[in-house]
Amino acid sequence: MPRLLPVEACDLPEDYDPSVPPRTPQEYLRRVQIEAARCPDVVIAQIDPKKLRKKQTVSISLSGCQPAPDGYSPSLRWQQQQVAQFSAVRQSLHKHRGHWRSQPLDSNVTMPSTEDEESWKKFCLGERLYSDLAAALNSESQHPGIDYIKVGFPPLLSIVSRMSQATVTSVLEYLVNWFEERNFTPELGRWLYALLACLEKPLLPEAHSLIRQLARRCSQIRAGVEHKEDDRVSPLNLFICLVGRYFEQRDLADCGDPS
């Protein structure tokens, strides 16, 4: 293979020291030759498999949401209002992120590492939902007062402002996957809303897949709700609306009447 810098042998001073900065073009090119000769012909990358994400391939389902039962679908006007409010929340969060990031966390708040899925689910949802609900409720009756370890930490601005995009996407994945096998709860809803507000556009493929998965799951839960007065209907409609309207996944959005 021809050399990139075919430098012929040149006369260099006897006191030439390759460890000091070159003083002439000849010394510089000679320095490059010496460094190139020291490079191995084959380099093997040392990869830590723990740092690789479990899913190397992102599969995006093209299936849509289940249609809303009669009387459950929100109006187009309501959806537009929710999108406008959500947009304002995102702008405010972006504007004040630096301020909230600088605020100290309470002494009882320890944010898990990005890769610690189980700790994040406990952190967001609390032990009441993560583990044995009945046992946790009995424990609460013996120890009155708010115990965030049991009920979960709310998505305070001082917390979510510290989360990188990688952490936001990972925690969203943890909670959406948890939601796939369980019902909707207010604790889950608060965190999902906060994480969606933290997602930066344009969406990464992983985030794009996750929000579509979220909307479809919300439509599944909504389709099984017996009464439209159920407290879950409004937040389920909200997430379908945000995914479909704000994040422009139009095929998942409720049509809604104009009123």
Swiss-Prot record:
Alphabetical UniProt keywords: Cytoplasm, mRNA processing, mRNA splicing, Nucleus
Location(s), subcellular: Nucleus, Gem; Cytoplasm
Tagged with keyword Membrane: no
Cited Pfam families: SIP1
Membrane-crossing segments per the record: none
An annotated GO cellular component: cytosol
Coarse class of the protein's main subcellular location: nucleus
InterPro entries: GEMIN2, Gemin2/Brr1
Tree of life domain: Eukaryota
GO terms for biological process, alphabetical: spliceosomal complex assembly; spliceosomal snRNP assembly
Subunit description: Forms a stable heteromeric complex with survival of motor neuron protein (SMN), GEMIN3 and GEMIN4. The SMN complex is associated with the spliceosomal snRNAs U1 and U5 in the cytoplasm of oocytes.
Function: The SMN complex catalyzes the assembly of small nuclear ribonucleoproteins (snRNPs), the building blocks of the spliceosome, and thereby plays an important role in the splicing of cellular pre-mRNAs. Most spliceosomal snRNPs contain a common set of Sm proteins SNRPB, SNRPD1, SNRPD2, SNRPD3, SNRPE, SNRPF and SNRPG that assemble in a heptameric protein ring on the Sm site of the small nuclear RNA to form the core snRNP (Sm core).
Family: Belongs to the gemin-2 family.
PANTHER family in UniProt: GEM-ASSOCIATED PROTEIN 2, GEMIN2
Annotated protein name in UniProt: Gem-associated protein 2
Native source organism of the sequence: Xenopus laevis
Lineage, uppermost ranks: Eukaryota, Metazoa, Chordata, Craniata, Vertebrata
Gene: gemin2
